[in-house]
């Protein structure tokens, strides 16, 4: 597995969401928080974007996606 970090424009394209919808999803626990990659730069681990997209494609409920998001963020801290 690679540790690629995707910047916002790529994440929005991958998700098919607008910027405001993306940040609303983060606020509602439906997407992971970004990681700091510079003083004024953030990004998202590619594997997290892929896992959340796969869950949506599989028809997972919002509650199931919230559980996945919590797991992904906990895994970050454990790494």
Question: Which role does the model predict for each range below?
Answer:
Residues 1-28, 51-58:
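Polyanion-binding surface elements
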Residues 28-35, 61:
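Short, solvent-exposed alpha-helical "recognition" segments
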Residues 35-41:
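Short Lys/Arg-enriched helix C-cap and helix-to-coil transition segments
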Residues 50-78:
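A short, Lys/Arg-enriched interface patch at domain edges and termini
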């Amino acid at each position: 597995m690679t540790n690629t970090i995707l910047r916002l424009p790529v994440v929005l394209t991958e998700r098919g969401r607008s910027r405001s919808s993306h940040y609303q999803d983060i606020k509602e626990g439906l997407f992971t928080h970004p990681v700091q990659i510079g003083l004024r730069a953030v990004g998202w681990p590619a594997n997290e974007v892929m896992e959340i997209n796969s869950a949506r494609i599989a028809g997972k409920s919002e509650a199931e996606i919230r559980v996945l998001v919590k797991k992904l963020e906990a895994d970050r801290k454990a790494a």
